[in-house]
């Protein structure tokens, strides 16, 4: 059984939001998964779609796989480093803002 990975490290979107999209396509054949991602209104769908397309290209180029038989065997989202920022508040105070990022790992196989 062949499995091929594609990883996007440091995607500038929170892991929580990205997992909502990842849960929808886990275990689907790649053509159905791409269809779901194409018509999803979420920002994370576009990012995950690029990683899925990269995994498909890796399978085709490196392993000579047939695209019609591929399915998403695993997809997981890990939390990555946060960018710490401050925003001004009233009376000279400041609040910390964390700009979240995540690592997206997609594995396709047959």
Swiss-Prot record:
Cellular component GO terms, alphabetical: cytosolic large ribosomal subunit
Protein's GO biological process: translation
UniProt keywords, alphabetically: Ribonucleoprotein, Ribosomal protein, RNA-binding, rRNA-binding
Top-level taxonomic group: Bacteria
Claim: RNA-binding is one of the keywords in the record: yes
Keyword Acetylation attached: no
A molecular function GO annotation: structural constituent of ribosome
InterPro entries from the UniProt entry: Ribosomal_uL22, Ribosomal_uL22_bac/chlpt-type, Ribosomal_uL22_bac/org-type, Ribosomal_uL22_CS, Ribosomal_uL22_sf
Function comment: This protein binds specifically to 23S rRNA; its binding is stimulated by other ribosomal proteins, e.g. L4, L17, and L20. It is important during the early stages of 50S assembly. It makes multiple contacts with different domains of the 23S rRNA in the assembled 50S subunit and ribosome.
Family, per entry: Belongs to the universal ribosomal protein uL22 family.
Subunit and interaction comment: Part of the 50S ribosomal subunit.
Name of the protein in question: Large ribosomal subunit protein uL22
Natural source organism: Paraburkholderia phytofirmans (strain DSM 17436 / LMG 22146 / PsJN)
Annotated gene: rplV
